[in-house]
Amino acid sequence: MIKPTTDYADLEGCDLIIEAVLEDPKVKADVTQKTQAVVPEGCIYGSNTSTLPISMLAKASQDESKFIGIHFFSPVDKMPLVEIIMGKNTGEEALAKALDYVRQIRKTPIVVNDSRGFYTSRCFMTYPVEATNMLHEGIAPALIENSGVYAGMAVGPFAVLDEVSLELSYHIAEATKKALGDAYKSEACDEVVTRLYADLGRKGKKNRKGFYEY
């Protein structure tokens, strides 16, 4: 049985948890600790994150061997791929249970090792990032958006960011800046996303206004 919930009491007796909260290490650590206070000892803990290193998030866990990344893609009901991320100390039992679960819900798993952004975000995010850099340079947004579609992408780069949510993109960038410090390479897209989300309150599709209005 699969049950979505925000009530920790509902987690008692579960054998697999998939957490999907804000991309903020402190928030995720707090949820991890509160969850593990009520679940059975052998429960596998999956974190749905697109960029935060699993080995880092697992430090908040009571048993790092039971901690694994299970990354779904937006929109979840349409996207078949699920990225399963092995942390430094993730055990084979956690991997087996994650693979079994993903196959049961008829999605396609890929297993990757731990690295910031993993496989999919490191590769795919160049698409909306470079598009937003071009927007900052003054290139017409319609030209950028249509070029992506004409090149064969399912939707344009700005539609992608609205679907994923500008709020999420902003918090990912902030968490990455904090983690990397001086090693973080700021791009023009950071300024654009900050302007849209932090200054104008445009979160994307979730509040019906992002690059587009819905």
How should these model regions be labeled?
Residues 1-214:
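N-terminal glycine-rich phosphate-binding loop for ADP-containing cofactors
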